[in-house]
UniProtKB/Swiss-Prot annotation:
Fe cation binds at C91, H133, H137. InterPro entries: Peptide_deformylase, Peptide_deformylase_sf. It comes from Buchnera aphidicola subsp. Acyrthosiphon pisum (strain APS). The keyword Hydrolase applies. Keywords: Hydrolase, Iron, Metal-binding, Protein biosynthesis. Its cofactor is Fe(2+). SUPFAM superfamilies: Peptide deformylase. This is Peptide deformylase. It comes from the Bacteria.
Amino acid sequence: MSLLKILYYPDIRLRILAKPVKEINKKIQKIANDMIDTMYQEEGIGLAATQVNIPLQIIVVNTMEQKKNNLVLINPKIIKKEGDISIEEGCLSIPEYQASIPRSNYIQVQAVNLDGEKIEIEAKSILSICIQHEIDHLKGKLFIDYLSKFKRERIQKKFEKINKKNKKFSIKE
């Protein structure tokens, strides 16, 4: 396994629309496993392939403390939403910033697993939030897009300033 490089806001590659995975093969399995390793290394609970500059519809999630509970969803699609919940979210691509974002408390998701099987899962609370957050990434959407224009502009200026200082980000929005 190898660690993947996470893209940081305001890198425009975070806005790329992910393409569906056509075939589950060893390359896709390696990408998913590398994403899991990267998620743990960065102490996250979810990661979308677009966050590591892979424009494919793959997300990995684990909201539990045991590493055996990894959830890999390929070509995920939310088919049902219910209820409302809003808690502070963070993002590996927007480090050290959290905001309370409105989400659905309960979702049903159709996807394909790493064995190529079609699956349907139900998620609520933190797992629901995490899956919605990662699926947003596949659509080129960031959690800060739900904030007011004023807050988004402040965040962008902050990260552009960090970019200039650390030269961490190379591509701007």
